[in-house]
Amino acid sequence: MIHRYLDPDESLGELLFGLIMALTVTLGVRLLGSQDTLKPHELAIALIGCNVAWGIIDGVLYLLGSLFSRGQRNHFIRKLRKVSSQGEAISAIREEFGLDDDHLAQEKDLAAFYMATLDVLRHARIERARVRGKDLMAALMIVVLVSATAVPGAVPILLVGDPAVALRVANALQLCLLFAVGYHWARYVGANPWRTGLIIVGLCVVLVAISIALGG
């Protein structure tokens, strides 16, 4: 269901975002806080509240991004229709889509693609940029994904009696989930799953360390 509204890179990116935030909280408390005075319920509420808040923020930013993209597309179509020559129009499309640098096709195929794109855009109907139902569902999915990543960290904090052990379990679970996201990511890009999982874990740990060091 998620991938009906979000691309795999978007959904996996949101999971990483949420896990990094949750790990920043639990690892930061373990490294910098006093575990003797730790109040599990307060920490769990703070952890979940942080992820829910940032999930909402990220969802709203997604909606703004969708509006911006549609507005930008409409502006490009209007600009394209004002161009006096076909050569200028093709140049504008080349600049907008930027496929030349990817070396995905031969020049003659790219030229045919740009001509077809020009024909489509010249006859495209311009609609007012607005938020659609699919955008709202995608934003909701983002809120759910980012919020859900707080659960693996919050559950041990609430259920394990020893705060030090609870934090170790929470951190271990979150690191395992980071690896799982990287492992799953590799399936979409044809990379080595184990290597990708380990790279994602290492990269995210570095980001968490930077966040903690800077007071985040």
PLM-predicted stretches and their roles:
Residues 33-36, 62, 66-74, 158, ...:
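Transmembrane helix-loop junctions in multipass membrane proteins, especially transporters and channels
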Residues 1-52, 56-57:
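Cytosolic-side membrane-entry/anchor segment at the start of a transmembrane helix
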Residues 180-205:
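Interfacial loop-to-transmembrane junctions
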Residues 47-55, 143-147, 201, 205:
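Transmembrane helix-bundle signature of multi-pass membrane transporters/permeases
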Residues 71-142:
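Cytosol/matrix-facing amphipathic helices and coiled-coil assembly/linker segments
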Residues 208-216:
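Juxtamembrane boundary at the C-terminal end of a transmembrane helix
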Residues 10-19, 126-175:
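Transmembrane alpha-helical segments and their cytosolic interface motifs
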Residues 48-78, 82:
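Hydrophobic alpha-helical membrane-embedded segments
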